[in-house]
Amino acid sequence: MHAWLCENPVGVDALVWKELPTPVPRAGEVLVEIKAASLNFPDLLIVQNKYQMKPPLPFVPGSEFSGIVQELGEGVTHLKPGQRVACLSGTGGFGTHAVVPAQACVLLPDGFAMVDAAAFIMTYATSHHALIDRAALRTGETVLVLGAAGGVGTAAIQIAKAVGARVIAAASTDDKCAMCASLGADATINYSTQNLRESLKALTGGKGPDVIYDPVGGDFAEPVFRSIAWRGRYLVVGFAAGPIPSLPLNLALLKGASIVGVFWGDYARREPASNAAMMVELARWYGEGKIKPVIDSTMPLAELKAAYAHMGTRGVKGKLVMVS
């Protein structure tokens, strides 16, 4: 097998394409031949030693991928060689093969495209857990999605629309805003040229959004939280802007609002039955055409460094997917 190996986490340029022994699955594991792998923001951080999870060196980056089961480890009974799966394993995806825990594999239904499957689990599970479980989003409520043109943002737009919410999508360019509108966003804000607070006031008749979905953090956090509706729910999804914001807690008191943390990975570990039911619903919505990953582009796995560079420009709309 071949894979991109990180021997020194000082950045993308240190990654090396290497031939490695094909691993043998141990008990509870499966060997997967990888067909497609997507880039997520943690994949950029992990090779810079900036991510909260720091795998032992050397490691193969790539947290989310799809492929075909090749071999089963002892005790694996729910999968068979030849079956198509999507996997979320933290590392291992940017290679031709990977050994992963069997419980990290989701069996793909017929008609689920490999490229879509590689760009599905992390973003859609995060957004569903955030909006449906943590925020208890209701039909008719208004959701503000920050970073709306990114992977989790585009998933959040589609999931919010699937349950009948009104969506305001905020993004950094007119082109990205147009793409969000094409996904069903009812209104858009270009926060590079428009004032967020004034725009939200105008778009909500002064009420503010009921739910704020924030994977960005940074300087946008406080202005949008000041705009939140009474009994609003502010979802802390991530910090793509870099700095972790500090919110004045008196604002939560004055608005009767909730600041809600969203950590889908630990939710899946702690509440596996609920997570499994969520994945079934997401797969059904995909089959019904209610949700579909937005793929910015597909690139050969050999061009991973160029894909990382593109992702680093923040010009990506949806997800980048590497194909073998």
Residue ranges and their predicted role:
Residues 195-206:
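Short amphipathic alpha-helix with an adjacent loop that forms part of the alpha/beta core around
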Residues 1, 206, 283, 288-298, ...:
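C-terminal capping/lid region of NAD(P)-dependent oxidoreductase domains
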Residues 80, 118-194:
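Mid-domain Rossmann-like dinucleotide-binding core that forms the NAD(H)/NADP(H) cofactor-binding site
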Residues 93-96, 171-179, 244-249:
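Short, glycine/polar-rich helix-capping loops at beta-to-alpha or helix-loop-helix junctions
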Residues 219-291, 316, 323-324:
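Glycine-rich phosphate-binding loop and adjacent beta-alpha segment
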Residues 84, 142, 166, 232-233, ...:
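Short glycine-centered segments of the SAM/dcSAM-binding site in methyltransferase folds
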Residues 36, 45, 84-147, 182:
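NAD(P)H dinucleotide-binding glycine-rich loop of Rossmann-like/cofactor-binding domains
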Residues 21-38, 50-92:
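Glycine-rich beta-strand-centered segment in the early N-terminal region that forms part
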